[in-house]
Amino acid sequence: LPDRITCGCIFSNELIDAMPVHRVTGDGNHLRETYVGLGMHGLCDEIRSPSSAALREYFAEQNVHLEEGQQAEVNLSACRWIEEVGKKLERGFVVTIDYGHEAEELYDQRHMRGTLLAYQRHRVTEDFFRAAGEQDLTAHVNFTSLDLRGRQSGLIRTGFTSQSKFLLALARHGNFADLQSDELSEAENMQRRLLFKTLITPEGMGETFQVLIQHKGTRRPDLAGLQPL
């Protein structure tokens, strides 16, 4: 990012989920952190005390308590990133699209094993050391954290919605009128429609991906993508 952004829109799509995370486990009123160690047979998990007090503060500021044995991820890099964005942006918007939830849902009992997954050639696994350096490691985004840390640097929450509702609201205002083109074949137009469908259906990306919009230096705008359906 430049040192100063006088006016603009900072847009990201699947940026935050690719940032490194801390893996922690609830231990009564305390936390334990999972480190990467080196054992007799290669890389392995090592459970020790948290590496930073910021991990405890992260949950405290969101009023989140992990159950005994509950695993979770903490993306401190995302906290630093949104704080930096807020400090450098003087007027404009921050649009963050990614898969994840707000804290209340992200850290509920449906996610007792956390959300960290490894991807390689369309294969999903929780064996993070199987092909070290060759797998993509991703964890769900905590949008509550982005909201709270953004506020600390002047970003105001404009709105939060699912990708499905966001795109359908935009479509209602004619923003995808050129989705079909007379210059394309019927097969190409069909492919476009199918690709758009994957972005809005619950079975595709529609409800998995969320959209967080924040603004700074301007009145709260009435954005088409945030209008109720």
What are these regions (language model features)?
Residues 1-28, 72-76, 80, 86-95:
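A short SAM/SAH-binding and catalytic strip from SAM-dependent methyltransferases
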Residues 5, 23-32, 39, 44, ...:
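Residues in flexible loops and secondary-structure boundaries
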Residues 8-59, 110-119, 228:
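A mobile, often basic/glycine-rich helix-loop segment
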Residues 55-229:
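Long, Lys/Arg- and hydrophobic-enriched amphipathic alpha-helices
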